[in-house]
Amino acid sequence: MTTMAETQTWQTVLGEEKQEPYFQEILDFVKKERKAGKIIYPPQKDIFNALKLTPYEAVKVVILGQDPYHGPNQAHGLAFSVRPGVPAPPSLQNIFKELHADLGVSIPSHGFLEKWAKQGVLLLNAALTVEAGKPQSHANIEWHRFTDKVIESLNDHPEGIVFLLWGSYAQKKSQLITNLRHRILKAPHPSPLSAARGFLGCRHFSKANQLLHEMGRGEIDWALDEKVS
């Protein structure tokens, strides 16, 4: 017997939203910016990587970011993750520190989080593009309208999801998560500016697995392999 989650996909829950004029306007804006010679991250093919790598029916955990990394070769469509061979930025270093303190897993030499995404961890930024060297430069082109819709669609997910909301921006999204089957864990942002105020020591990785276990869902293997393709 198939469950409702198995019959739902990102296409079925977001298909109508993608037909809205504002969504096409976002894509047109990004296309024009590239055509004008501006460098936009991530590359076009990677913009929707979070949704491609973590199918709707497979989502177990959601980690929300604000916007993509704005340095060369970093962003590839997964919040907090960087491409293989690129050093982990400071926030990700703190995520790894907490992961090590929480679960004892070794800190990897890379910051490529695709393994998490493929296990059901949706690594979603509120804005899906950014201009090189200009953080939050695309924060006002209505990406948030689309990504809020993503969160709302997950609120309707028939199985329990654990939302990890780090920092005040992500925590504002908790108002979109009203279904009591889901669980929300909050902590300060892992940025060096705030990590010591409670992100370090939050133990969200073990807590998320405990909640998934209680909900009858498979736990996440948070340890990252040393070799990545």
From Swiss-Prot:
Cellular compartments per GO CC: cytoplasm
Protein name: Uracil-DNA glycosylase
Highest taxon listed in the record's lineage: Bacteria
Similarity remark: Belongs to the uracil-DNA glycosylase (UDG) superfamily. UNG family.
Molecular function terms from GO: uracil DNA N-glycosylase activity
Source organism per UniProt: Coxiella burnetii (strain CbuG_Q212) (Coxiella burnetii (strain Q212))
One Pfam family linked to the record: UDG
UniProtKB keywords: Cytoplasm, DNA damage, DNA repair, Hydrolase
Catalysed reactions, semicolon-separated: Hydrolyzes single-stranded DNA or mismatched double-stranded DNA and polynucleotides, releasing free uracil
Function: Excises uracil residues from the DNA which can arise as a result of misincorporation of dUMP residues by DNA polymerase or due to deamination of cytosine.
Broad class of enzyme this protein falls into: hydrolase
Main location: cytoplasm
Keyword presence, Cytoplasm: yes
E.C. number(s) listed in UniProt: 3.2.2.27
Residues at the catalytic site: 67
UniProt xrefs under NCBIfam families: PRK05254.1-1 (NF003588), PRK05254.1-2 (NF003589), PRK05254.1-4 (NF003591), PRK05254.1-5 (NF003592), ung (TIGR00628)
Alphabetical list of InterPro entries matching this protein: UDG_fam1, Ura-DNA_Glyclase_AS, Uracil-DNA_glycosylase-like, Uracil-DNA_glycosylase-like_sf
GO biological process: base-excision repair, AP site formation via deaminated base removal
Protein location: Cytoplasm
